[in-house]
């Protein structure tokens, strides 16, 4: 058994390349890596002539940034300082010299730095501008009403809160070992100018109220409701538009189903299945196609309790004993699918069923037939006929309806009119009552008529109320002894009902009313 040879690691690329320079064998990968002729280097050279990829750190070397590492952008590299002995240059007489720095104070000979003295009572807030006062120049035009040029004063107030300078002084040592300090004075700030416009908008003078020294603690605000303010505007007034205004859009056609995406896929799949060149299109107007399609295929009786329209119906029929179908369009139908509903281009509903006909049978018993698409278009419900009604009581002239109940009269008690009073004679009628050509009508019966009424013999106090026939009033009749009492005559003969005998007519008695007698026959039977 052979011992396994241990793999020895190859020397570094730098050492191998040095040996190549001395004449040793040089692997091609080492030479290409050191000389920069690898595939990646060539691609960088090719694309570098087209695209500029400088300062991106793209290369085949390490990603460590070298021995010194990466430097952040925008910062300068500060060399690390190593502790050591500082040797200062000397002059004759052994006078030590300090180098002059750029604004950074160095250590003086005495070992002490100049210190700025700060007053203990000064404010702890250091303002941006110090020592130098602000000079304010007020330029005004002609003096307006109530405001003259002599009332404007120029005030300059220094702020001596903090004593010091903004920059550090430069310190150097002289020959006699004395310290000289150079104060750097900051530049003078620009002069502020205030321009007063004396033009007034009205004829009334503007009253200016000045207050003395007012601090934030005792500030008072006076509000006068009777006073009116002036509107001050600078520049042109530009109307601002609404920001983030909601967008308005119109939907061309809203979805008609709750799932438009799935519905569209279903319609597409159904159209491909029912409407293609391999399916025969067969319209029908058979009413049984909507509810009981089996009655259109064959003569049979089906129990409605076991009928299911949601399944595919199959009809077993031998071709040798073919019977005629109730509907000629459904002849030789072997299979009929469930009902499918769709919408036509005219907006009506279409009921479709996919069927298969058994028109051919092979010797092996296989039945072959064409697929047929039976569909029934349900007609839409027409709109009801509208009949224009005519206006009742129409007239050829204009008229106006006046309702006195709905009319209103407004009386203003505070308003007084001087039209005068209306006299009473205006309210009286001017017509005189005249009875010329008048006719007096008595609502009584004629004298020639007589009425026969049964009465009681005289002597009995009885009052009768007889209604008048000619008018709808009541007349009171008092009985009197002078009246003639008419008593109706009683007939002597007894009144019997009249009987008429017609000798020119005859009648036939119904046969069941006659008694049956043996061996007796009537002449008219």
Swiss-Prot record:
Q: Which Pfam families match?
A: Late_protein_L2
Q: Does the keyword DNA-binding apply?
A: yes
Q: What is its main location?
A: virion
Q: What is its quaternary makeup? A: Interacts with major capsid protein L1. Interacts with E2; this interaction inhibits E2 transcriptional activity but not the DNA replication function E2. Interacts with host GADD45GIP1. Interacts with host HSPA8; this interaction is required for L2 nuclear translocation. Interacts with host importins KPNB2 and KPNB3. Forms a complex with importin alpha2-beta1 heterodimers via interaction with the importin alpha2 adapter. Interacts with host DYNLT1; this interaction is essential for virus intracellular transport during entry.
Keyword set for this entry?
Answer: Capsid protein, Cytoplasmic inwards viral transport, Disulfide bond, DNA-binding, Host endosome, Host Golgi apparatus, Host nucleus, Host-virus interaction, Late protein, Microtubular inwards viral transport, Phosphoprotein, Viral penetration into host nucleus, Virion, Virus entry into host cell
Give the species this sequence originates from.
Human papillomavirus type 60
Give Gene Ontology CC terms.
Answer: host cell; host cell endosome; host cell Golgi apparatus; host cell nucleus; viral capsid
Describe the PTM.
Highly phosphorylated.
Q: Which family does it belong to?
A: Belongs to the papillomaviridae L2 protein family.
Disulphide bond pairs: 20-26
The task this protein performs is described as: Minor protein of the capsid that localizes along the inner surface of the virion, within the central cavities beneath the L1 pentamers. Plays a role in capsid stabilization through interaction with the major capsid protein L1. Once the virion enters the host cell, L2 escorts the genomic DNA into the nucleus by promoting escape from the endosomal compartments and traffic through the host Golgi network.
**Entry's Gene Ontology molecular function annotations:** DNA binding; structural molecule activity
UniProt KW Aminoacyl-tRNA synthetase keyword: no
| Location within or outside the cell | Virion; Host nucleus; Host early endosome; Host Golgi apparatus
Q: Which InterPro entries match?
A: Late_L2 (IPR000784)
Protein name, per record: Minor capsid protein L2
Nuclear localization signal: where is this motif? 2-11, 515-522
Q: Which GO terms describe its biological process?
A: microtubule-dependent intracellular transport of viral material towards nucleus; symbiont entry into host cell; viral penetration into host nucleus
């Amino acid at each position: 058994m052979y011992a396994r040879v241990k793999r020895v690691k190859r020397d570094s690329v730098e050492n191998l390349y040095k040996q190549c320079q001395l004449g040793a064998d040089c692997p091609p990968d080492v030479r290409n890596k050191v000389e920069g002729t690898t595939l990646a280097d060539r691609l960088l050279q090719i694309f570098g002539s087209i695209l500029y990829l400088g300062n991106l750190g793209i290369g085949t070397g390490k990603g460590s940034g070298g021995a010194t590492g990466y430097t952040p952008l925008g910062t300068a590299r500060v060399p690390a300082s190593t502790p050591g002995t500082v040797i200062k240059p000397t002059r004759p007489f052994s006078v030590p010299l300090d180098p002059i720095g750029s604004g950074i104070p160095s250590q003086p000979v005495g070992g002490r730095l100049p210190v700025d003295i700060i007053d203990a009572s000064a404010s702890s807030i250091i303002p941006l501008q110090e020592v130098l006062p602000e000079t304010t120049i007020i330029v005004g035009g002609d003096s307006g009403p109530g405001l003259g040029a002599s009332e404007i004063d120029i005030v300059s107030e220094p702020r001596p809160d903090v004593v010091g300078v903004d920059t550090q002084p430069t310190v150097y040592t002289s020959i006699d070992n004395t310290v000289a300090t150079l104060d750097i004075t900051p530049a003078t700030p620009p002069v502020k100018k205030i321009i007063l416009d004396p033009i007034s908008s009205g004829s009334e003078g503007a009253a200016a109220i000045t207050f003395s020294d007012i601090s934030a603690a005792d500030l008072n605000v006076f509000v006068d409701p009777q006073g009116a303010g002036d509107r001050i505007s600078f520049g042109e007034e530009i109307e601002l538009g609404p920001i983030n205004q909601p967008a308005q859009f119109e939907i061309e056609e809203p979805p008609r189903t709750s799932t438009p995406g799935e519905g569209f896929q279903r319609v597409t799949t159904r159209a491909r299945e029912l409407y293609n060149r391999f399916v025969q299109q067969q319209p029908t107007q058979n009413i049984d196609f909507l509810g009981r399609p089996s009655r259109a295929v064959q003569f049979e009786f089906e129990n409605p309790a076991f009928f299911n329209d949601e399944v595919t119906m199959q009809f077993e029929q031998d071709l040798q004993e073919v019977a005629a179908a109730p509907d000629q369009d459904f002849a030789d139908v072997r299979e009929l699918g469930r009902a499918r509903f769709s919408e036509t281009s005219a907006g009506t509903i279409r009921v479709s069923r996919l069927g298969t006909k058994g028109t051919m049978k092979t010797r092996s018993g296989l039945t072959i037939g064409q697929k047929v698409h039976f569909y029934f278009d349900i007609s839409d419900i027409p709109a009801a006929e509208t009949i224009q009604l005519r206006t009742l009581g129409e007239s050829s002239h204009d008229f106006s309806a006046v309702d006195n109940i709905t009319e209103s009269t407004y009386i203003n008690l505070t308003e007084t009119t001087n039209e005068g009073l209306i006299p009473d004679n205006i309210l009286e009628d001017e017509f005189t009552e005249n009875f010329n050509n008048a006719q007096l009508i008595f609502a009584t019966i004629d004298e020639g008529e007589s009425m026969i009424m049964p009465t009681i013999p005289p002597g009995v106090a009885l009052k009768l109320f007889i209604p008048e026939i000619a008018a709808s009033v009541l007349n009171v009749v008092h009985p009197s002894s002078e009246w003639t009492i008419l008593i109706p005559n009683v007939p002597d003969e007894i009144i019997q009902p009249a009987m008429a005998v017609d000798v020119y007519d005859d009648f036939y008695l119904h046969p069941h009313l006659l008694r049956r007698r043996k061996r007796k026959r009537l002449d008219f039977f």
